[in-house]
């Protein structure tokens, strides 16, 4: 189906769910991923496996703050990764991730959003951030 990665660090505004810019397509056999909106459009009804990970806070963040990523379907959050706290250590690079199976309908729109309660950055190179989807079953 598809896999896309990020290629650079982007600003992550404080306390805002921000669509992750997975801007480099590794493959897209179903032509379902849009690199302008960073959204996948489901090509047919079925169960899809989604994997997502994103580097957050290139230089770490303070212990009083948290970060996570979420899957949004048609503009609504449907899954959230574990939340992690900062460590006050600039060597700490959080990489929240999600791996789920979802029942989706044709034309559902899926994107990944990053969140940090402190203003930081997200993304990084392809070794840190990736979003992929594949059809695993037709219902």
Regions found by a protein language model. Give the residues of each.
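Extracellular jelly-roll beta-sandwich "head" domains, especially the C-terminal globular C1q domain
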Residues: 1-139
């Amino acid at each position: 189906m598809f896999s896309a990665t990020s290629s650079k660090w982007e600003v992550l505004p404080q306390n805002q769910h921000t669509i992750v810019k997975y801007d480099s397509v590794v493959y897209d056999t179903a032509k379902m991923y849009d690199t302008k909106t960073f959204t996948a459009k489901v090509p047919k009804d079925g169960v899809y496996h989604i994997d997502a990970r994103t580097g957050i806070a290139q230089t770490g963040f303070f212990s009083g703050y948290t970060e996570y990523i979420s899957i949004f379907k048609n503009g609504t959050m449907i899954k959230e990764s574990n939340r992690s706290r900062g460590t006050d250590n600039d060597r700490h690079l959080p990489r929240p991730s999600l791996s789920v199976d979802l029942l989706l309908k044709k034309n559902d729109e899926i994107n990944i959003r990053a969140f940090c309660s402190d203003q930081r950055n997200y993304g990084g190179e392809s070794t840190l951030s990736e979003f992929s989807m594949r059809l695993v079953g037709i219902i």
